[in-house]
């Protein structure tokens, strides 16, 4: 691959790296808040997403060739709010990344002859779209009071011990390990 030095793509990589790195930290902070708010599954989703953002940043960082590079970029300077607000803010950031930032960065990389980097930008955008959907789905569940309650009987799994409960809602305490309702999630069987 030809050198990135002085290209717009080099600046875009560093901008995306900085954004992914900051998102990782925000998601770790938001995960802590979710746990405080009684949403262990959402806390774990924030942690998982933070790890995925770290991997995006690492992939991008490996393209850089060293030295100092000045970029001008705006990043969210928000606060740690309640879990619902944190999910909405996170979804907005992911939306920007997959609808505007990464498609633009991929186009510029192609124009400058960096096809591999363009593919990476486009691939990261796919992950960001999934992140947005998941954040919005959890936000909707909080707003509608559906995190631990459903109209139809379903199966709920304790994330701490694996106990499975069937009913319209998660139990207040797990009968197997005595952990609170915060540790339950809908049982998802994807194998």
From Swiss-Prot:
Naturally occurring in which organism (per UniProt): Nitratidesulfovibrio vulgaris (strain ATCC 29579 / DSM 644 / CCUG 34227 / NCIMB 8303 / VKM B-1760 / Hildenborough) (Desulfovibrio vulgaris)
Pfam families hit by this protein: Rubrerythrin, RUBY_RBDX
Residues reported to bind Fe(3+) 1: 20, 53, 97, 128
Domain of life, per lineage: Bacteria
Membrane spanning stretches: none
Lineage start: Bacteria, Pseudomonadati, Thermodesulfobacteriota, Desulfovibrionia, Desulfovibrionales
Necessary cofactors: Fe(3+)
Broad class of the protein's primary localization: cytoplasm
Subunit structure: Homodimer. Possesses two rubredoxin-like centers and two non-sulfur oxo-bridged di-iron centers per dimer.
Cellular localization per UniProt: Cytoplasm
Name of this protein: Rubrerythrin
Cellular component terms (Gene Ontology): cytoplasm
InterPro entries: Ferritin-like (IPR012347), Ferritin-like_diiron (IPR009040), Ferritin-like_SF (IPR009078), Rr_diiron-bd_dom (IPR003251), Rubredoxin-like_dom (IPR024934), Rubrerythrin (IPR052364), RUBY_RBDX (IPR048574)
UniProt binding sites for Fe(3+) 2: 53, 94, 128, 131
Name of the gene encoding the protein in the UniProt record: rbr
